[in-house]
Amino acid sequence: MYKRQTLNNGIKSVPTEEENYLIDLYEKGSQKADVIKMVPASGSATRMFKKLFTFMETYKGEAEEFLKFVQDKSPDSMHEFFLHLNEFPFYTHLKNVMWNDEQDLQKMLDKRMFTNILAYILTEKGLNYGDTPKGLVDFHVYRDFVRTPFDEHLVEAALYCKKGREAHLHFTVSEEYVPRFKDRLAKVSKVFEKMFNVKYKVTFSIQKPSTDTVSIDENLSLIHISEPTRLRCIS
C-alpha cells in the first residue's frame, strides 16, 4: 500500500438499493461457513498521547508559556484539549480516580494545574493511558456505560459474526497486555452476551518481534517497524 484509500480509490460505495440484498446474501452465507472476526489490537496508546506527554514534561506554567497556551486555539492545541476535557469519554473515569485521591478536577482546572491533571491521565497515578493498549481506552459514551474499542468489536461480532448463538473473535495483542484484555473480556462479556443473546468464543495471539519488517514511504524514509503476521497463539 503506497497511499491511503479513499472513496472510489480502493473503497467502493454500495448503492442504497443494493444494501438489503447484500446484507441478506451475507447473513445466509455466513450460516454455512465458520465466520470469525479477526482484530489486530497490539497497538499501544502511547503515540496517541504524544502531545500530552510533551506538554506534561515541558510546561512550567510561567507567564509567557501560559500566554502562548491560551492564544493557540487550533483544533489540536492543548488549550482546546483542556477546554473540551469534559467531552472526552474518559472524563467521568478521570474525575472518579482523582476524587478517590481527594482531588477535584474542576478546581485543578481553575488553578491551571494542567500537568497534574495530565499525570492522572497518562501515568499509574490515574488512568495510566500512557501504558494502555488503544483497544482498552475509554472510547464511546452510552447512557449508562462507556465502551472501549475492544467492547465495540465484541458488539459488532454479535451483530454480524454470529452462527447460531456463537460469535467467534480473534485478537492479536502485545504480550504484556494479554492479562488486561482478558480482564476486560471477563468484565463485559456477560453483559453483551445477555444484551445480544450470544455466546462469545474469544482467542488471542501474539506477534513475534522477530517477524517485524521495515516500512518506508515514497521518499524511501523510514516510517515504522511493523507488519506482517506470523503469530504465536495463546488461549
Task: Give the location of each predicted region.
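Single conserved hydrophobic/aromatic residue that forms the stacking wall/gate
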Residues: M1-Y2, I223-S235
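Short, conserved secondary-structure transition motifs
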Residues: E175-R180, T203-L220
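Low-complexity, serine/threonine/proline-enriched polar segments
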Residues: L67-L127
